[in-house]
Amino acid sequence: MFGWFKGRRSKETLKDRLELVLAYDRAKIAPGKVEALRNDLLEVVQKYFPSGNSKVEVEQDGDKVVLMASISIEEASLSTEEESAAEDKSDKPSA
């Protein structure tokens, strides 16, 4: 309920967020830009693999800001070349 029992203490969460803000500042990247990129990546992944459990995390690696993508690809969601070609044709407007 309200995220209180998720196992992370607010002190740890606050520390992680502060580290990310400092990393954004060092890299001269606006935090909103990284969050928008994260959301766009998730949207694209969901387009191709709608049933997979995917997440994109923003982490600090030294002085670098790193986006880590974890994409779960289920066998049933993989398309054959023929299905992909059919999808491409249906996306094109008819002349």
Swiss-Prot record:
Domain of life where this protein originates: Bacteria
Chain intervals with Basic and acidic residues compositional bias: 86-95
Keyword Translocase set for record: no
One GO location term (cellular component): plasma membrane
The keyword Cell cycle belongs to this UniProt entry's keyword annotation: yes
Region ranges (Disordered): 76-95
GO biological process: division septum site selection; regulation of division septum assembly
Keywords: Cell cycle, Cell division
Family: Belongs to the MinE family.
Function summary: Prevents the cell division inhibition by proteins MinC and MinD at internal division sites while permitting inhibition at polar sites. This ensures cell division at the proper site by restricting the formation of a division septum at the midpoint of the long axis of the cell.
Entry-linked NCBIfam families: minE (TIGR01215)
Protein name in the entry: Cell division topological specificity factor
